[in-house]
Every structure is written in structure tokens, then in C-alpha cells.
């Protein structure tokens, strides 16, 4: 039974003392605060409480002077109970002795400490453990504890508490221990390794806190009195805001604060915007070029880290990153003879130590300028993928492409000016060359020249390029030489993916702006299609785009058979939009697996302005199918043996079969309907209506040479309509007049003769041209007339019906 309900429960003093500990320290603070307030009350109030208290005490004493504590506050100390023998220490009349409180605190009572006090206590514990380990030469413990106090210092500086004195004492303590120990005396390999590690770390930390260490050496006792080390205010007198914006500003050394920010990057508890604000303040007080360079090399990636979890970097932050990269390049351009940043420099141990000068008097700093430009370009592309392409925001955002291209060119020229080793230069220029081609390969020649001119106009005069010279900018072949030169350099790289990408860029540009046959030969000789399925999705999408552009290039020259052959396999796919990278990013995110990262999904789609119009692709393929399949279909139905055409679900033959089954056939509405009506007119030999339907398709306006293409298309429709007419009516006529056919299809007589003779020879049709070349005489062949065909069909159906109505008697 619980003691609360037991009548004979004996109160145990020992349990009472343990139960008294249940009173939390927060309650004591609350009561002590109320005690200080009660002392300021009026005397009348005090007398009132004193009287009531004395009465209650008298009652208790008279009733049960020896009774144990009882009531709802039985577990409290006597001075806190309203009843039960002890007087309240908060009342003036109580005989409370302050020595009781001191004794209670000495008995191990918990005291509420601030986070700063707890951190200082942890540092003090480290100091004590290192002191003990120093006596036994336990360098493993010293190394671990010195590691711990370094992490505690980072926590203190993140909260802008400065550098505690105890930390300086520990550094001095470990430094003295290192100096007093000889490595030869350490026989254990693990201990010797820990000694070397500690020696390097304490050397670095001591140099970072050189001023504080000097003060400690001069006056060690002063560091026992103050809670934190007082660092001298720098000459610049700048202040750094706290991470929360509410703590008091502190003044610290430039590189000490910069090192703290570098150590804080990547931690989940760090406020990225606070780091950016701190770095921006550091830039306002930087004086030397080295300080500016190191601050920008830290600030730029910090801006990208701040938006790492977003779909794309906000435009205002993107422009800030762009400005920072531009300023960094400007500083590097101005100090190119003194400081250079590249990926092949040696790392430095201490950020405040400038690199040593090489034989040319240049201090080389480890860093990747183009990684910033590349990340900026990726964020730009992501923003285009997430903005509505049909809105004005997309066009406004697209204007920044020129700025990105300018940075790419500036970075390329900086590499050419700073890297002397040819091997290093080729490695460094690979990525800028790929990015330049990525921004221009799909554009027309005029647009590329405009971009190049604008980019070169902002380049300082002292920068020259041996790969893409500015001197040839006014020549007519500048763009061709640019694309070919960049592609040739990249095709010599060891990376096979880069080689294939460079070749595909060149083929696409050639097919779009130049000659189809040249682009086709480049594709066949390069063997770029070999194992293309084994490469990443972006390269496969580029290959599919090249194939489509090659087909469109053939169509512009009215090479119908070539165009149909190129596009047939690609358009047989039911996911044309996906294989061309033209689906929306949102749709990819819904269909992708959970393992696919955001970057992988972004590589599977292209911005809207790079898309190839799908309607144009469809109408080109349907038109090619119309000109090839309609004459062959007519010849086949006329009993002529023709070569089978590869099947395609988007062919005009399938559309006609579906159209003939419709119960209602309305006027044309879609582009497929217009091509379908053009096919029906061609079957009748009416080439004028066929051309009229084709010309009403609005997608032709996307072709740069629309009128030239339509004129060539008209001539081809006339020829194919002539073939269709000849196949349809040769079984009804014994001869065809060349003059009549020329008048009917608006073709020269020699053209009519040439077309029909080639058809007769190819398909082995029993017909020939007379000696005067005016009449085609058709011999009677094996084909049957329409009337005979109908009779055969009717006779077959009659036999089937007769057998069904009158089955044989012996049939089981």
C-alpha cells in the first residue's frame, strides 16, 4: 500500500533528505526572486503575514509539537512549508540563518548555469585532463582533449563569445608540453603519431592566436581573472554581427574570423545567411588584394550553399553571386602579375599565410574560378526550367544568358594568360570550351556572331586568345572557324564523352546553318552513334536532337527519301518529347524514382528556347510519308509489286486507314488533318488541292527558308501526283498523251517523260514510249479492272454465304 494512505507509516529522515532533493533548482530561483520582492513590501503587509504565520505555528505547536511533516507540501524543506514546524525564510520574522543555505549548496545542490558557463566548465575539464595526461606522457589523451577544446572554441566563436582565456591557457599548456618532450623518447608508434599530430595542431592554433599567446606569456595571472581573452581591436575597428543578430558585436582579427566561417561551412546548425552577412562585412574592411581574394573564394560558394535545398537559386541571390564572381575576376585581372588562382596550385596550411612566390614572382592560390561560373550557369538553367516558358518572366530571365557567356569567355582568357604548362592549360580549358559550345551550338550564325561581339567588347585589351582570336571577328567565316576549332580541340581529349559531345555540337551546327551532306558525312565518319546508349542521358538527348536536326536539314533541301529514312526510327517512339529532353521538369520529378537527384532530373530536360518544335517534326515526317507512300499504295492496289516501306505508327498510311473508317469526315482542323486531306487529293491526281492544303499548315513559318522549301515541295507534289495518276488509271487507258499529262500537272513534257520512264523501268510496268516520244502505250497486264475486282469479291462472298446456309449433309 502507498505510504500516502498508510495510517502507521513511519517517516524516515533519510528518505526525507533524498526526497528534498526533488525540489528543482528552477523552483529555488523562483522562490528566491520572490523573497527579494517581499522585502520591499510595506510594513503593514509584513505584519499581516507575520501574524498569520505565528498563528499557524502556534496551532501546530499546541496540537502536535512532535508530529512528522504532513500535508500537500510534506516533501519540501521546513523553511518552504506553510505548515509543519519550519518558519518561512522569506518572512522578516523568521529565524532563518543564511548559513543553512550555504550548507545546502555545499551538499551538492544543482545550480542553473548559462550555456556560456557550461562551455567554460567543459574547457576547464579539458585543462585538468591534459594536466593529468601530461604527467604520464599520455599523448593520445592530450591529442583527443586538444581536439575537443578546438571544437568547443568553434562553438564559442559561432555564438560570438570571443576566445576564452582558458583556451589560451590550454594552448600554452600543450605548447609547453610539446617543447619539453623529445620524440625520440616515445617508443610507442601510436603515442609518437599522436605527439606529431598534436605538435602540428598546436603550432597552427598558436599562430592564429599569436597576440593572445604573447599576452599570456607576459602575464599568465591575468588570464585567471577574466572569463574571456581580450583581443586587441584591429586598426580597422570593424564589428561582426552575431549569428542571431541580437548578440553584442565583437571585434576579431580578419583571418581568424574568416577561418571560423570556413570551419562552420557545411554544418546543419549554421545559419548560412549569417555567414554571408559576415563575409560581406569582412569585404568592407579588407585592404590587401589577398584578403579580397580569400574572402570572395569563401563568399561565392557560401551563396550557393544557402540555396542548395531550393529548386534554383533566387534571382536576386544569383545576381549577387554573378557580381561577386565579376569582382573577383576584376581583382585577379588587376593583380595578375602578383596573385593567380588556379586548380593546380599547392594548398597552404594557414589561411593567413600568403603562398610563396614562384620563379616568376607570382603567388599562386588554390581555387577553381570556373567551378563558380559553372555552378552559376547551372543555377541559371534550373531557373529557366522552373519558370513558365510562355510568360514574360522567361524572356526577362533569358537576357542573363549573355552575362553568363561573358563570364565563360573571361575565364577562358584568364586561364590562357596564367597557365604556362600546355598540359594544364588543355585540362583547364576543356570545361569552358564545352560551356561555350553548349550556349551557341543550337543558334543561327547571326545570333552567335552577336553574342561573340558583345562578349569580346567587355574583355580588357591585354587579353588575347590563340584558340578563338578576336581579330577574325569581322570575317564571314568567324563562326564556322569558332565552332570547328573548339570542337577539334575537345575531340582530342582523352574523355570519350567529351569527344562525342564536341562532335555532336559541330554536327548540329552544321546541319542547322550549313550543308546537310557535310553534316551527314561527319556523323557517319565519326561513328559517334557507337555505344551511345551507354552514356549519360544528356548525351543521348543531344544525339537524338542531332538526328532530328539532320532530318530537318534534308527536308529543307527537299531530300524527301533521306529525311524520311532519318526520322522514321526516331518518330516510331511513342515518347518523342522525352527522348528529345523537351518534357517539363515537374513531369520528370513525378515520373523519376526517389533515388534520382535534382541534378540528374535537370539533365533530362532542356530549357524551352532550345526545344525543336514537335509540330514541325510531325508535319515534316507526315509530308515525307505522303510523298513516298501515296504513290506506292496506289501502285500496290493496282496489282504492281512494290518494295515494302518500313512500318511507322505515324505514317500517312495508318492515318488514311483510320480516316476511312470514320462515320463523319469534317473539314481539316489539325496539321495532321491538312496532310491527310492533301493525301486524299493526291490519290485523285488533284495536285493543286494537295499543295493548297499543305501551304495552309502554319508550322512552315518556323523554317528559315519557308518559301524556297514550299516551292520545292510543290514541284515534288506535282511529280508524285503524276505517278499516282498513272498507277491509278493505267488499267483503264491503253495510252497516255505526254502533252495532256504535262498540261494536267503543269510540268514540262521532258519532265513527264523522264518521270514515267523511270517508274516503268523500276517497277517493270508493261508500258513503253513511242518513237515520237508523245504517247505512252500501256500493254494489257495481269491486273484486273475495278469492275472485275468487284465481281471477284462478290463471288467470294456468295460462296461463303451459300456454304453457311446449306451445309453439306456428311459434315459432322
From Swiss-Prot:
Domain of life the protein comes from: Eukaryota
A Gene Ontology BP annotation from the UniProt entry: translational initiation
This protein's GO CC annotations: cytoplasm; cytoplasmic stress granule; eukaryotic 43S preinitiation complex; eukaryotic 48S preinitiation complex; eukaryotic translation initiation factor 3 complex; multi-eIF complex
Chain ranges of the PCI domain: 608-783
Record has Protein biosynthesis as a keyword: yes
PTM-bearing positions, type Phosphoserine: 98-99, 103
Pfam families in UniProt: eIF-3c_N, PCI
Compartments (UniProt record): Cytoplasm
UniProt-recorded Gene Ontology molecular function terms: mRNA binding; translation initiation factor activity; translation initiation factor binding
Coiled-coil residues: none
UniProt keyword list: Cytoplasm, Initiation factor, Phosphoprotein, Protein biosynthesis
Annotated segments matching region Disordered: 1-110
UniProt miscellaneous comment: Present with 78900 molecules/cell in log phase SD medium.
Function per UniProt: Component of the eukaryotic translation initiation factor 3 (eIF-3) complex, which is involved in protein synthesis of a specialized repertoire of mRNAs and, together with other initiation factors, stimulates binding of mRNA and methionyl-tRNAi to the 40S ribosome. The eIF-3 complex specifically targets and initiates translation of a subset of mRNAs involved in cell proliferation.
Subunit structure comment from the entry: The eukaryotic translation initiation factor 3 (eIF-3) core complex is composed of TIF32, PRT1, NIP1, TIF34 and TIF35. A subcomplex of TIF32, NIP1 and PRT1 mediates the interaction with eIF-1, TIF5/eIF-5 and HCR1. The factors eIF-1, eIF-2, eIF-3, TIF5/eIF-5 and methionyl-tRNAi form a multifactor complex (MFC) that may bind to the 40S ribosome. TIF32, NIP1 and TIF5/eIF-5 comprise a minimal 40S-ribosome-binding unit. NIP1 interacts with TIF5/eIF-5 and SUI1.
Family classification: Belongs to the eIF-3 subunit C family.
Identification of the protein by name: Eukaryotic translation initiation factor 3 subunit C
Amino acid at each position: 500500500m502507498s505510504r500516502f494512505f498508510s495510517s502507521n507509516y513511519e517517516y524516515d529522515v533519510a528518505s526525507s533528505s533524498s526526497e528534498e532533493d526533488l525540489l528543482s533548482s528552477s523552483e529555488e530561483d523562483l522562490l528566491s526572486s520572490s523573497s527579494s520582492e517581499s522585502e520591499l513590501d510595506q510594513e503593514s503587509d509584513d505584519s499581516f503575514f507575520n501574524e498569520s504565520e505565528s498563528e499557524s505555528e502556534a496551532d501546530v505547536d499546541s496540537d502536535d509539537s512532535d508530529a512528522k511533516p504532513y500535508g500537500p507540501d510534506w516533501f519540501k524543506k521546513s523553511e518552504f512549508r506553510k505548515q509543519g514546524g519550519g518558519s518561512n525564510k522569506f518572512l522578516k520574522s523568521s529565524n532563518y540563518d543564511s548559513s543553512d543555505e550555504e550548507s545546502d549548496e555545499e551538499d551538492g545542490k544543482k545550480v542553473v548555469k548559462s550555456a556560456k558557463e557550461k562551455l567554460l566548465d567543459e574547457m576547464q575539464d579539458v585543462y585538468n585532463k591534459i594536466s593529468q595526461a601530461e604527467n604520464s606522457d599520455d599523448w593520445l589523451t592530450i591529442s583527443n582533449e586538444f581536439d575537443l577544446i578546438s571544437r568547443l572554441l568553434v562553438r564559442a566563436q559561432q555564438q560570438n563569445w570571443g576566445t576564452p582565456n582558458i583556451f589560451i591557457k590550454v594552448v600554452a599548456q600543450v605548447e609547453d608540453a610539446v617543447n619539453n618532450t623529445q620524440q625520440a623518447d616515445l617508443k610507442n608508434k601510436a603515442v609518437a603519431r599522436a605527439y606529431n599530430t598534436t605538435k602540428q595542431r598546436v603550432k597552427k592554433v598558436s599562430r592564429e592566436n599569436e597576440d593572445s599567446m604573447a599576452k599570456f606569456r607576459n602575464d599568465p595571472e591575468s588570464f585567471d581573472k577574466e572569463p574571456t581573452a581580450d583581443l586587441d581591436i584591429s586598426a580597422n575597428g570593424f564589428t561582426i554581427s552575431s549569428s542571431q543578430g541580437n548578440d553584442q558585436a565583437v571585434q576579431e582579427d580578419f583571418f581568424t574570423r574568416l577561418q571560423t566561417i570556413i570551419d562552420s561551412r557545411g554544418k546543419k546548425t549554421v545559419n548560412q545567411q549569417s555567414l554571408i552577412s559576415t563575409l560581406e562585412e569582412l569585404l568592407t574592411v579588407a585592404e590587401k588584394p589577398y584578403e579580397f581574394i580569400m574572402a570572395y573564394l569563401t563568399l561565392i560558394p557560401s551563396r550557393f550553399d544557402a540555396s542548395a535545398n531550393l529548386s534554383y537559386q533566387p534571382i536576386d541571390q544569383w545576381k549577387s553571386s554573378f557580381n561577386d564572381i565579376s569582382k573577383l575576376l576584376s581583382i585577379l585581372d588587376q593583380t595578375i602579375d602578383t596573385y593567380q588562382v588556379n586548380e593546380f596550385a599547392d594548398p597552404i596550411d594557414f589561411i593567413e599565410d600568403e603562398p610563396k612566390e614562384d620563379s616568376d614572382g607570382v603567388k599562386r592560390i588554390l581555387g577553381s574560378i570556373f567551378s563558380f561560373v559553372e555552378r552559376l550557369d547551372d543555377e541559371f538553367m534550373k531557373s529557366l526550367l522552373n519558370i513558365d516558358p510562355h510568360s514574360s518572366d522567361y524572356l526577362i530571365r533569358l537576357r542573363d544568358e549573355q552575362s553568363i557567356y561573358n563570364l565563360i569567355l573571361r575565364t577562358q582568357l584568364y586561364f590562357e594568360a596564367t597557365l604556362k604548362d600546355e598540359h594544364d592549360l588543355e585540362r583547364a580549358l576543356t570545361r569552358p570550351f564545352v560551356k561555350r559550345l553548349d550556349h551557341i551550338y543550337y543558334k543561327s550564325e547571326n545570333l552567335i556572331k552577336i553574342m561573340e561581339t558583345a562578349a569580346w567588347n567587355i574583355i580588357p585589351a591585354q587579353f588575347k586568345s590563340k584558340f578563338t582570336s578576336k581579330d577574325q571577328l569581322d570575317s564571314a567565316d568567324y563562326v564556322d572557324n569558332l565552332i570547328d576549332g573548339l570542337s577539334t580541340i575537345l575531340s582530342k581529349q582523352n574523355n570519350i564523352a567529351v569527344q562525342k559531345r564536341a562532335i555532336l555540337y559541330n554536327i548540329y551546327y552544321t546541319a542547322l546553318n550549313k550543308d546537310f551532306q557535310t553534316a551527314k558525312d561527319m556523323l557517319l565518319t565519326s561513328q559517334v552513334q557507337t555505344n551511345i546508349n551507354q552514356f549519360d542521358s544528356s548525351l543521348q538527348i543531344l544525339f537524338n536532337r542531332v538526328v532530328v536536326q539532320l532530318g530537318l536539314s534534308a527536308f529543307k533541301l527537299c531530300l524527301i527519301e533521306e529525311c524520311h529514312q532519318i526520322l522514321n526510327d526516331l518518330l516510331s517512339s511513342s515518347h518523342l518529347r522525352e527522348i528529345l529532353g523537351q518534357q517539363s521538369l515537374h513531369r520528370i520529378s513525378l515520373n523519376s524514382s526517389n533515388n534520382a537527384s535534382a541534378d540528374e532530373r535537370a539533365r533530362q530536360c532542356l530549357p524551352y528556347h532550345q526545344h525543336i518544335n514537335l509540330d514541325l517534326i510531325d508535319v515534316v515526317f507526315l509530308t515525307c510519308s505522303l510523298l513516298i507512300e501515296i504513290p506506292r499504295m496506289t501502285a500496290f492496289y493496282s496489282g504492281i509489286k512494290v518494295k515494302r516501306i518500313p512500318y511507322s505508327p505515324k505514317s500517312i498510311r495508318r492515318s488514311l486507314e483510320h480516316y476511312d473508317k470514320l462515320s463523319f469526315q469534317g473539314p481539316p482542323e489539325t496539321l495532321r488533318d491538312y496532310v491527310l486531306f492533301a493525301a486524299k487529293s493526291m490519290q485523285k491526281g488533284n495536285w493543286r488541292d494537295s499543295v493548297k492544303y499543305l501551304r495552309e499548315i502554319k508550322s512552315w513559318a518556323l523554317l528559315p527558308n519557308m518559301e524556297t522549301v514550299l516551292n520545292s515541295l510543290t514541284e515534288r507534289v506535282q511529280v508524285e501526283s503524276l505517278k499516282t495518276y498513272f498507277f491509278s488509271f493505267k488499267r483503264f487507258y491503253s495510252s497516255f498523251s505526254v502533252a495532256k499529262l504535262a498540261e494536267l500537272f503543269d510540268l514540262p513534257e521532258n519532265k513527264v517523260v523522264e518521270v514515267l520512264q523511270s517508274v516503268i523501268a523500276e517497277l517493270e510496268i508493261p508500258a513503253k514510249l513511242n518513237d515520237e516520244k508523245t504517247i505512252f502505250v500501256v500493254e494489257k497486264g495481269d491486273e484486273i479492272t475495278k469492275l472485275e475486282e468487284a465481281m471477284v469479291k462478290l463471288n467470294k462472298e456468295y460462296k461463303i454465304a451459300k456454304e453457311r446456309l446449306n451445309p453439306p449433309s456428311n459434315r459432322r
